[in-house]
C-alpha cells in the first residue's frame, strides 16, 4: 500500500497535490443516518486555512469544501463520502529555482530517491496543503463522536520556539491566530514572529490536544493500542517529530509511586497515563502533545546539492508558514477524532454487547 489511508473501519484516503487543480478525501465506513452538510465541515477548515494573519503563509485559499457523494437528503448513506477542495491560488513559478535542487530538511531528496520523479511546486504531495482534506474528514468524525458520545476535542499551542505559553483559558484559544490559551502572551508571540519573518527564518512549536468524554474500553491490544494508533496518526502530520501521551517523556524521571494514577471510588487521582492504560481508554481525558519542527522552506541561503550531486545554494521564495505549528491545532484535533471514531466502531463491532456495570468510577477525583 502507498500509505495514503488512515483507519480500518472508518478509513480516510486523501488525494491531490499542493499545486494541482484540487485536493480531497474519501471517507469509507461513515455510519449512515447522520445529518451532514458542508456547513458542518467548513468551520474547521476556516480555522486551518492559509492567509488568515500575517504570521502564516499569504497564499489565499478559501478552502470551500464540496460533498460529492455519500450524502442524500442531508444524511449520510453509509457509502463513501468524497470531499473536494479546489486549489485557486497556486504560484508554481515561485518554485522554478528549486526544481533541480533539494531543500535542506524537506522531503525533496527522499521523494526523488523513492519515486525517481517529484513535483517541486509547493512540495507536491508532501505539502502541508494536504492537511486540509484531513481536517475536513476530521470534522465529520468530530460530529459523529459528539452526537453519539458527547466527546469534545480541543487543542491549543503551548510553546512557540523558546516561548512557553502558560495555560489560562480555553475561551482565549479562538481569539488569536496562534490558538494560544493566554491573551497576555499574544503580543510577545506577535513580536517574535515579526522578527522571525524579517530574518527569513522559521521556528517550531508544541501543540496540545485533549479529548473529553471518551468512554472506557476503546483500544485494541497489543499492536493496535489506542495510544499507538494516535501516535501513528500524529506522526503522519507534516513536520511532527515527536508525540507524547499523558506525562510522555516526563515519565522517565518519575517514580512508579508518582506515575501510576491511583484509583479511588471518587475517581482517578491523576492522569499521567493520558487517559490510556494497556492501550485501552480509561474514561479520562485523552491528552496528546506534539513537537513540530521549523518549516524547511526559508529565505535564508542554505547549502545543498543538485540532481547531479554538485554543490548548490538553496533559497526558497514561495509563500510559506514561518511556523507550521501555528495552523496545526485544528489538524491535530482532526487526527485525534479520526483515530477515536475508528476505534469506536471497532469496539462496537467486537464488544458492543459487553456491559460491565461495576466498578465504575468518575474520570476525575472530586
UniProtKB/Swiss-Prot annotation:
The gene is aroC. One of its GO terms (cellular component) is cytosol. It is an enzyme of class 4 (lyase). It comes from Ralstonia pickettii (strain 12J). Its cofactor is FMNH2. Homotetramer. This reaction introduces a second double bond into the aromatic ring system. One of its GO terms (biological process) is aromatic amino acid family biosynthetic process. InterPro entries: Chorismate_synth, Chorismate_synth_AroC_sf, Chorismate_synthase_CS. This is Chorismate synthase. PANTHER family: CHORISMATE SYNTHASE (PTHR21085:SF0). Its EC number is 4.2.3.5.
Amino acid at each position: 500500500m502507498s500509505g495514503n489511508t488512515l483507519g480500518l473501519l472508518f478509513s480516510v484516503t486523501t488525494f491531490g497535490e499542493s499545486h494541482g487543480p484540487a485536493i480531497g478525501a474519501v471517507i469509507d465506513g461513515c455510519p449512515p443516518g447522520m445529518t451532514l452538510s458542508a456547513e458542518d465541515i467548513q468551520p474547521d477548515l476556516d480555522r486551518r486555512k492559509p492567509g488568515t494573519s500575517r504570521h502564516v503563509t499569504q497564499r489565499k485559499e478559501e478552502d470551500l469544501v464540496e460533498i460529492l457523494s455519500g450524502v442524500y437528503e442531508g444524511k449520510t448513506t453509509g457509502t463513501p463520502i468524497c470531499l473536494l477542495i479546489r486549489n485557486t491560488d497556486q504560484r508554481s513559478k515561485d518554485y522554478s529555482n528549486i526544481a533541480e535542487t533539494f531543500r535542506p530538511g524537506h522531503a525533496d531528496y527522499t521523494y526523488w530517491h523513492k519515486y525517481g520523479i517529484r513535483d517541486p511546486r509547493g512540495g507536491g504531495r508532501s505539502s502541508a496543503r494536504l492537511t486540509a482534506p484531513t481536517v475536513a474528514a476530521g470534522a465529520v468524525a468530530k460530529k459523529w463522536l459528539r452526537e453519539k458520545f458527547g466527546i469534545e476535542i480541543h487543542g491549543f499551542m503551548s510553546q512557540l520556539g523558546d516561548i512557553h505559553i502558560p495555560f489560562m483559558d480555553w475561551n482565549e484559544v479562538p481569539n488569536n491566530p496562534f490558538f494560544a490559551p493566554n491573551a497576555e502572551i499574544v503580543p510577545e508571540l506577535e513580536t517574535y514572529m515579526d522578527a522571525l519573518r524579517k530574518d527569513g527564518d522559521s521556528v517550531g512549536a508544541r501543540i496540545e490536544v485533549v479529548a473529553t468524554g471518551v468512554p472506557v474500553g476503546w483500544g485494541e491490544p497489543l499492536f493496535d493500542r489506542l495510544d499507538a494508533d494516535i501516535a501513528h496518526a500524529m506522526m503522519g502530520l507534516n513536520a511532527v517529530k515527536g508525540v507524547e501521551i499523558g506525562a510522555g517523556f516526563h515519565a522517565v524521571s518519575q517514580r512508579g509511586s508518582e506515575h501510576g494514577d491511583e484509583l479511588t471510588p471518587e475517581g482517578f487521582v491523576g492522569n499521567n497515563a493520558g487517559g490510556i492504560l494497556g492501550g485501552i481508554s480509561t474514561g479520562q481525558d485523552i491528552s496528546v502533545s506534539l513537537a513540530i519542527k521549523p518549516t524547511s522552506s526559508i529565505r535564508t541561503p542554505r547549502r545543498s546539492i543538485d540532481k547531479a550531486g554538485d554543490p548548490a545554494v538553496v533559497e526558497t521564495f514561495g509563500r510559506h508558514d514561518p511556523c507550521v505549528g501555528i495552523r496545526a491545532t485544528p489538524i491535530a484535533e482532526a487526527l485525534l477524532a479520526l483515530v477515536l471514531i475508528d476505534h469506536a466502531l471497532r469496539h462496537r463491532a467486537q464488544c458492543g454487547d459487553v456491559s460491565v456495570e461495576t466498578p465504575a468510577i468518575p474520570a476525575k477525583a472530586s
